[in-house]
């Protein structure tokens, strides 16, 4: 496409000196960096981003209601945002997933991990021949038709299901959406395979897109710690860690969650893998409350898995989240036998690995126990983190030996 025929986009002009992050190819423009918008742009529409002197920097999506005023689609001035653009991005992402799927024997994985795959606000998980789509930004929603067309080109045999029913959309002025887009409706529970486990996924009603694919490697790593051990699996959801613990030869695993539906699926997952159901206990309760009750009754465990939901959504909540993480890890440490293992995680993007490690150290001091950090975890390799967007590393975890 020549310069004369290239689409003319509205221009977002940055204040003087506020272009540095874009020059380092960070994909966000915050409201404080914006001087003005030249031309009219609807919510999610494509805009050009320029410095205060008019020098072109990037092309992105406009979101006037968000603190993130623009999310960058491309740093290539010659690249138009159209079906061909999304097709290229999908095929680039698929190359890595193809290698992973073949290497690890996967039938389910994250196909698109937002900014780290060059598609800000777009999450796509593949479960067998179902593609589960989440559009989390105004730009992603604006380009919905182009993205779906590209998906149909790249994956003609796959059904597409929309799970854009997440509250973060409201921050950018968008309604929540859910339902089939193309192809058949997913079954109530779809079986997938992961590291030798068969697991049932609730695409339509489960958390996020139905299953936490990002913890795949952590679930596998659990097996090395659990042989002949008594395991407590907190915030168990549908039992991925529990099934992995049983496959690792644990003596007992107690799974705790507030959702009876999730616990019912966890039980089915144990049965589906033909594991000893008598070694699995399922408890519907609040984890904080139950841990305190266990402490009062002198219960002890050899391994505790702590995989809570996100405690922090924004910086104003960070201090409160730190207290929550410290309290719950302190309780877990108190329940472990000497030499026991704590596998603890945080999926809060604002919680850095260094801060999380400090919180665990503080929790150990409050519990009156010494702790050794023996292994570190992050999201699985189908959730890459592009170097210019460190915020993409949201999941972090540690294996800790409690003395």
UniProtKB/Swiss-Prot annotation:
One of its GO terms (cellular component) is cytoplasm. It catalyses: cytidine(1962) in 23S rRNA + S-adenosyl-L-methionine = 5-methylcytidine(1962) in 23S rRNA + S-adenosyl-L-homocysteine + H(+). It comes from the Bacteria. The keyword Cytoplasm applies. Keywords: Cytoplasm, Methyltransferase, RNA-binding, rRNA processing, S-adenosyl-L-methionine, Transferase. Disulfide bonds: none annotated. It is found in: Cytoplasm. Pfam families: Methyltrans_SAM (PF10672), PUA_3 (PF17785). Its EC number is 2.1.1.191. GO terms for molecular function: RNA binding; rRNA (cytosine) methyltransferase activity. Residues 9-88 form the PUA domain. InterPro entries: PUA (IPR002478), PUA-like_sf (IPR015947), PUA_sf (IPR036974), RLMI (IPR023542), RlmI-like_PUA (IPR041532), SAM-dep_methyl-trfase (IPR019614), SAM-dependent_MTases_sf (IPR029063). Belongs to the methyltransferase superfamily. RlmI family. Specifically methylates the cytosine at position 1962 (m5C1962) of 23S rRNA. HAMAP family: 23SrRNA_methyltr_I. This is Ribosomal RNA large subunit methyltransferase I. It comes from Salmonella typhimurium (strain LT2 / SGSC1412 / ATCC 700720). The gene is rlmI.
